Amino acid sequence: MADVTHQEPQGDVTDASTFDTEQLGFMCGIEVHQQLATGKLHSRQPSELFDVTIDSVPEDWPRYARKLRLASGEGGKVDVAARFEKRRNRSFVYIQSPNSGLIELDESPPLSHDSDALDVALTVSAMLGAKPVGAVQTMRKTVVDGSNTSGFQRTSLISTDGTLKTDTGDVGIDVLCLEEDSARKLDTIPTDQGEQVIYNLDRLGVPLIEIATSPDIQTPEHAKETAMALGRTLRDTRRVRRGLGSIRQDLNVSVACGDRVEIKGCQDLGWIPRIVRLEMVRQVHMYRLANELRSSLGLPQLPPNRDRDDIGIESEVAEAVAKHIPLEYTDVTSAFASLSLIHISEPTRPY
């Protein structure tokens, strides 16, 4: 393939069909998260979801109030997201459903992996030709929004280096993991001490298979084809959950003149090509706007391939921009204090 990413991106941002994905240096990968129809991953509780809302939760279900504390990691540094969450000063209430116990409440150590969930993960690995790891070790991802009582999500790498066959072309499978799903948010209540978020623990700990592809997707339509092929592979095991919310696709999209952007929660497969195209166009549009602003200040232009950014030049640009846009904070609370909020019911125009 010829290197065309040295050229300026060609196309009209008002019409995504005018762009050539190859000329843009288009790259795309998909992450799929699929709930399994097994027991919970690190407790022997059933993965049953209860059809309740904040108004219909049975009164005899216990409730527990918690507040996450800021702490440094093993490297001695405090996570940026955790620091931001502390400033929000939120508290959390967890409703204990019949299928949640001490492990879900973070009052007891987790058990080993559910054997059925591990078997499904290895089955999918074999279907994708992925290579299982020598030993399964559980990692912890920081979660600070309160959706996990422990403050982190447990994830285990199961296999790597697989291949998904599609009509358009093969797509590499980088990793296949087993991880815990989060608790379900039921409501957010404003209080004098900050927001109080209410969670239902029925979904916490439900096993998820996470499959991350290589950036081998060639076109927006191929992204949809890949998502459909992954979903078909998972359903062929006959051991995954079905229905709304049981599977989620995250899209990673980039073009040469932009940056990698992760778009989370693409539920409707039919929307994937449109979402990918809009993200391609958005990145090109932001690139052009950035160069237009740089031209107005007499600053060097961004290269059409961001891999060729010059650190020295970008540092000088940052210093010049800081002189024109000083980072000063102004309290505008009084200007908006007398305003009232209204609900806009008129539908907005679609893109």
Regions from the PLM with identified roles:
Residues 2-341, 345, 349:
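Basic, nucleic-acid-interacting segments
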